[in-house]
Amino acid sequence: MIIIRAMGGLGNQLQQYALYKKLESMGKDVRMDISWFRNADTQSKLLKKRDLELDYFTGISYRTAESEEIRGVLGRLWEEKESVVSKVGRKLFPSSTPYFTESDMYHEQVFGFTDKYLVGYWACEKYYADILGKLRGEMRFPRSEDAELEDKNEAAMHRMEETESVSVHIRRGDYLEGANYALYSDICTEAYYEAAISFLRDKFPSARFFFFSDDIPYVREHYRSDDYEMIDWNHGRDSFYDMMLMSRCRHNICANSTFSFWGARLNAHEPKIMIRPSLHRNNQVCDPERMKALWRGWTLITPQGKVLR
């Protein structure tokens, strides 16, 4: 049995689910461990509390791992789960431990596992690129119970369908706090967004840009144009409707955020242009050729505004 730990925000959860469905499509016996969201100690260490959001979607289905099944895969490590001994053992003897922790952009070996507990975010699209069509069919957004919100989103989707629409995601918020600042800042720079917008304007002079952000006042101050529109009404639990609206745009400019990666992945328009930063974190080594191989179909742009071709 393969058990995948579900953790993190909505974008990360969707990636873990996507890997689950890929392994399931290969005939593997797979489960999702959702206990991370109930762990008070884990949640207390986060800048922002996370909830299990997979179930917001109407078409998603998965089997959850019971405690006995987790214990069966982890064996004696179940008792020492996060002890120093178990952590050192996993690093020194990775093949002998039932744990497998993501440590690179892509691990081909995950497809050969039979009994493993997988810990990671699995952002690389190569893991599940061939089943994205199926995933789009499963990741269906429900109608909002708020009639006014539903009407606003419906009207926005209509405008997106009628124009050469481009979603632009600018994430600030928790990326400017604590340790996150060193990890995520200065990647999606003004030069990055200027290059991305210019790239699409050159191809589509009539393009209309729809901005999504957790800091709309900043966006209003820095991005002003007659062909810009701010989407600023989906808040709290309803924030995931921003992903729905991103997916209805014809093209997508993403932040270094799995949330907007999924907005682009769920975009069913063809042809389409998906733009993402050339790296996700500042501690990531950026090999342009490898990134292009792992993210086929995407346009990569550096923090300096260089388009990688």
Where in the sequence are the language-model features?
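Aromatic-acidic/polar surface patches that form glycan- and anion
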Residues: 5-13, 185-189, 238, 256
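Short hydrophobic beta-strand segments
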Residues: 1-6, 31-32, 116-119, 162-174, ...
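Donor-binding and catalytic core of enzymes assembling or modifying cell-surface/extracellular glycoconjugates
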Residues: 10, 194, 198-285, 290
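Short, aromatic/basic amphipathic alpha-helical patches
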Residues: 42-57, 219-227, 287-294
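N-terminal pre-catalytic "stem/leader" segment of glycosyltransferase-like enzymes
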Residues: 1-44
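Leloir-type glycosyltransferase catalytic cores
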Residues: 282-309
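Secretory-pathway luminal glycosyltransferase catalytic domains
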Residues: 45-199, 203-204, 302-304, 309
